[in-house]
Amino acid sequence: MHLRIKICGVTRPEDAELAARLGADAIGLNFFSQSPRYLTEEKAVEVVHAIPPLVAPVGVFVDPTADQLNFWGTRLALRTFQLHSFDPTVLGPTFGAMCWSSILAQAVNEPDDLEKIRTLVREWRTSTREVPDPAVLVDARVAGKHGGTGQTVPWELLAGFDAGVPLILAGGLTAENVADAVRQVRPYAVDVAGGVESAPGIKDAEKLVRFIDAARSAAAGLP
């Protein structure tokens, strides 16, 4: 099984370089101002310039306006957008021309949340016909938080679940539990922020190595 790995909440160029060198497929850049991993324009430019070719920078946004997406997409040449708590009807035609791929976030804590994923995908397809189908990032629900909570999703709910689009598993993943998560859920990708950090936004080299090795090894043993 081929597993993609996204290292999210990167705030330093050296961490972007290290994650890419170790085999990360994508680097998440957080533009939610209330996040401890929030990037200013100056710092975001530095991080993006450190990401090598064929590794995707991903802009992470919470309830964004079309103007915000257009600004950051243009400023950083972003083509992949991760959207939390957003209204697809406000995205506008410029976003459709700019966006090559999108990731929609959905919290999952109970069985009824699986239907919310299907609804999210249907609404996206209806409202953004000019944009390709999204992936869905699944995270744990914690009141007032948009990711980075350290809480795990009930993996057993996602075992065998098919949303009709790629599934990205987030939520409390670490080097110690990612192998079990991959074997149970078999996601398209895994996403980690706090599980590979020494402090918010500061990636830990040893944790990165162990996480990526554990995730890749687990996926390699699956058909």
Give residue ranges: language-model regions:
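Conserved, mostly hydrophobic/aromatic
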Residues: 19, 81, 136, 154, ...
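Conserved anion-binding
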Residues: 31-35, 43, 48-169
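C-terminal helical cap(s) of enzyme catalytic domains, especially alpha/beta-barrels
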Residues: 41-51, 93-95, 193-223
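Glycine-rich phosphate-binding active-site loops on the catalytic face of alpha/beta enzymes
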Residues: 24-35, 82-87, 141-142, 184-208
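Extreme N-terminal starter segment of soluble prokaryotic enzymes
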Residues: 2-5
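Structural motif
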Residues: 22-23, 75-76, 131, 184-185
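A C-terminal functional module that forms or caps the active site or interfaces directly
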Residues: 164-184, 197
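A short, Lys/Arg-enriched amphipathic alpha-helix followed by its capping loop at the start of a domain
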Residues: 18-24, 51
